[in-house]
């Protein structure tokens, strides 16, 4: 009798285990503020391929894909970075403030060129060649729904992204945090709700405090390396210039998120993918940008680079004193020896002019 009872118990236990939902793992790989620094794309390609071999992957970008490297910024339509992203199979991206640097027509063409959706909930296209973008996408992985809602900063001058007023004519931007709050209803349509933002860490934290339905905020704009939890919401960011890739591991069982964790992975840890390495070398094969434009007698750190820039500004303008905002100096150092046209461009990739 005891053997029969034990046998029935084991059968019931096996049946219950068979009915229990299995744990599913999805990896979200994220980049932000690449700023045209495509030299690490071959390493990123290796990292993405290795991850896809072992898990279901979603690959996303949080804006500012260009402005910072002459080999991209001087190319037609800033295509090199977009071609690399298309080839790598990004799943979704949002706009950063520097996406608008190229002008609205070029940006509209760039969005059309992307083989992945570019989304933004708080940009309203009223009289612009830029189309009205979708506010969100819902992606399926492992039979589960992942909703991504996006917003760009409107916290610059005149309630638009940082940049000159003229490049935003015909566009209107609603408050990013308030707009993202309006999409909390998507919680009913997905297992994981993600805000893909280019608003900076201050406003990401505000969003986490105000919109508790979000599970995850993948941010950009403030160029920080962030891995923190604010009011139960995981906030992440990878810094800038594609030195790191963000790895968010989502573990699901049934309708429940069992765990959500993030780590930053240095791309220097990976060997370059030869196909992407060849693509990057092709983009960098621009003889005009390699021409000598000057010479440095000593290596300059960022302060030294800023002084060189300001001396040129002072001389060109004929002024007694020159000022420039520190964040606009985009080279942290210059090495002793020849300076190329590319080096000069990279000092200030915003195409500023002095009259």
Tell what function each PLM region has.
Residues 1-4:
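Positively charged n-region of N-terminal signal peptides that target proteins for export
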Residues 6-10, 18-23, 35, 51-54, ...:
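Non-catalytic terminal accessory segments
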Residues 19-277, 302-312, 322:
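Acidic, metal/ion-coordinating pockets
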């Amino acid at each position: 009798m005891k053997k029969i009872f034990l046998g029935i118990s084991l059968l019931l236990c096996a049946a219950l285990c068979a009915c229990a939902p299995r744990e599913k793992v999805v990896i979200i790989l994220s980049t932000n503020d690449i700023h045209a620094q495509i030299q690490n794309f071959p390493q990123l390609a290796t990292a993405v391929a290795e991850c896809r071999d072992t898990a279901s992957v979603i690959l996303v970008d949080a804006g500012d894909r260009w402005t910072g490297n002459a080999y991209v910024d001087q190319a037609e339509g800033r295509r090199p970075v977009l071609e690399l992203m298309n080839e790598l199979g990004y799943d979704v991206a949002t706009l950063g403030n520097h996406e608008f640097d190229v002008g609205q027509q070029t940006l509209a063409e760039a969005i059309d060129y992307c083989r992945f959706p570019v989304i933004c909930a708080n940009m309203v296209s009223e009289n612009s060649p830029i189309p009205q973008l979708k506010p969100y996408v819902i992606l399926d992985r492992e039979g589960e729904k992942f909703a991504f809602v996006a917003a760009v900063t409107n916290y610059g001058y005149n309630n638009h992204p940082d940049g000159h007023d003229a490049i935003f004519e015909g566009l209107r931007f609603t408050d990013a945090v308030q707009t993202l709050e309006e999409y909390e209803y998507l919680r009913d349509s997905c297992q994981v709700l993600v805000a893909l933002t280019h608003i900076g860490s201050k406003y990401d934290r505000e969003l986490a405090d105000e919109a508790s339905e979000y599970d995850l905020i993948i941010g950009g704009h403030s160029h920080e390396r962030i891995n923190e939890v604010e009011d139960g919401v995981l906030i992440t960011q990878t810094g800038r210039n594609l030195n790191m890739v963000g790895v968010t591991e989502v573990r699901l069982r049934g309708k429940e998120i069992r765990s959500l964790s993030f780590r930053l992975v240095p791309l220097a840890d990976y060997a370059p993918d030869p196909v992407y390495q060849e693509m990057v070398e092709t983009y960098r094969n621009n003889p005009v940008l390699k021409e000598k434009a000057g010479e440095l007698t000593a290596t300059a750190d960022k302060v030294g680079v800023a002084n060189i820039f300001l001396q040129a500004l002072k001389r060109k303008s004929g002024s007694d004193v020159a000022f420039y905002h520190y964040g606009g100096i985009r080279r942290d150092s210059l090495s002793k020896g020849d300076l190329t046209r590319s080096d000069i461009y990279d000092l200030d990739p915003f195409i500023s002019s002095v009259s």
